[in-house]
Structures are given as structure tokens and as C-alpha cells.
């Protein structure tokens, strides 16, 4: 995602997301203004060593020159370097952004045509182009009790996994019942485009099975 760097003083990100790496490691970026703040601010309370950026009257620059707070996994670091090398090979940040944009266009075009799904976010300004979150909007589904809705999604996920189409696309734990697809730059946009019709198929298959059995919806 393009970042409004002129508005940002401190940015953190994990290797896990855009680089498809380990979730327990990440990067801290400080703007010149943030560095000035670190140099001049004296905390009113004790700060744990692992969180200290200030040392001997100024910014602890060793943290930004390769010094480690704790012993990292070198395999994780090599994996991140490998991901950066791949990103450079395909065209750098511009290519990564294009992959995300293309996947998002595929996603939104499909949502606009699907009779069963809507994006989770109600405000278009809050729709994430990378965490592609869906809810099922079909009238039959929304008329079912919560436990049935959860069962429908669980059955859909099992079908998709059995067909080697998708794994681990359940909604976030605290989000409404639905699906969550990662549309970051490490995912081929054509894979996103190929996945989406399968979601309609999985829902229609599970709904038909339930309607033909003990559950009967309105549609």
C-alpha cells in the first residue's frame, strides 16, 4: 500500500505481511522528527530494556546499525532477504503495488457481480486492498441463526480445502462470520481471480445440501 510518508513519524511492520515471512519479527522506521523526540524526551516512568530507544543522552543508533536486542533466528532474516531479492527481481515496490492493485480489482469486480457476498467494511474508505474480508449477504444465509451460519462457513472451508483451492481463509476470530483472503504482493493476482468463483460454488453447494436436508431456508 502506498504510505503517506509525509504524515508518518514512526512506522512498524512485520516480515509476515507484505514479505510473506515470520510474524514474530519486524522493522521500525523513525522519521527525523521522531529521532528528535527520542533525543529530547525523558520518560516519566521506567522503560523495559527491550523497548528503550534512548541511550547515553540520545538515540541508540546501534539498534539501526545491525545490533540486536535479542538473538534472532538467522533463518528468518535470510528468508526476509530472499523475499526482498525476489521483490527487486520483479520490479521493486512499483511491481509489488501493481500486484496488490490488480488483485483488488479482481476482488471488487467479483464482489460486484456475486449474488452471495459483500465486503465486510460498510464504509468504502475503510476497505482494505490486502485483507480481503467478506460476509455472506444471501437472504437464506442471513435468515439462519448464528450457529448455522458458522456451520455453513465451516463446511465451505472444508470443501475448498478438499479441492486444494484455499486454506485458512476463515474470518478473523472477533469479526462477523465470513471469509478473509490475503491479497498482498506475494500472492499472484491470477490466483485471486481463480479463487473467487470457487467461493460462490462452495456456498451454493453447502446451501443446497442444507436445504435438501433438515434445514429449509426461504430461498
Identify the meaning behind each predicted range.
Residues 1:
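Glycine-rich, mobile lid/loop segments that gate access to catalytic sites or pores
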Residues 4-16:
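Conserved active-site segment immediately N-terminal to the catalytic lysine
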Residues 6-8, 21-23, 127, 176:
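Short, solvent-exposed loop/turn segments at the edges of secondary structure
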Residues 10, 25-29, 131-133:
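Conserved hydrophobic/aromatic beta-strand scaffold that supports enzyme active sites
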Residues 16-110, 123:
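Active-site C-terminal subdomain of aminotransferase-like
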Residues 92-99, 109, 116-123, 168-173, ...:
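Flexible, glycine/charged-enriched surface loops at secondary-structure junctions
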Residues 112-197:
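Conserved C-terminal alpha-helix-loop-beta "cap" of PLP-dependent enzymes
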Residues 187-219:
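Structural signal for terminal/edge beta-strands and the immediately following C-terminal loop/tail
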Amino acid at each position: 500500500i502506498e504510505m503517506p510518508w509525509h504524515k508518518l513519524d514512526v512506522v512498524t511492520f512485520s516480515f509476515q505481511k507484505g514479505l510473506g515471512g515470520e510474524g514474530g519479527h519486524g522493522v521500525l522506521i523513525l522519521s527525523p522528527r521522531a529521532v528528535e523526540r527520542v533525543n529530547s524526551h525523558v520518560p516519566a516512568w521506567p522503560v523495559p530494556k527491550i523497548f528503550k530507544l534512548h541511550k547515553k543522552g540520545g538515540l541508540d543508533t546501534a539498534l539501526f546499525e545491525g545490533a540486536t536486542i535479542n538473538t534472532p533466528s538467522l533463518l528468518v532474516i535470510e528468508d526476509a532477504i530472499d523475499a526482498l531479492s525476489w521483490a527487486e527481481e520483479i520490479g521493486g515496490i512499483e511491481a509489488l503495488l501493481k500486484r496488490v492493485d490488480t488483485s483488488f480489482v479482481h476482488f471488487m469486480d467479483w464482489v460486484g457481480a456475486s449474488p452471495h457476498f459483500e465486503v465486510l467494511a460498510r464504509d468504502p474508505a475503510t476497505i482494505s486492498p490486502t485483507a480481503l474480508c467478506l460476509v455472506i449477504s444471501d437472504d437464506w444465509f442471513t435468515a439462519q441463526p448464528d450457529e448455522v451460519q458458522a456451520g455453513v462457513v465451516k463446511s465451505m472451508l472444508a470443501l475448498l480445502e478438499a479441492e486444494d483451492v484455499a486454506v485458512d481463509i476463515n474470518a478473523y476470530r472477533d469479526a462477523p462470520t465470513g471469509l478473509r483472503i490475503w491479497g498482498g504482493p506475494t500472492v499472484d493476482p491470477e490466483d485471486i481471480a481463480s479463487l473467487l468463483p470457487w467461493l460462490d460454488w462452495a456456498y451454493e453447494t453447502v446451501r443446497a445440501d442444507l436445504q435438501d436436508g433438515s434445514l429449509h431456508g426461504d430461498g
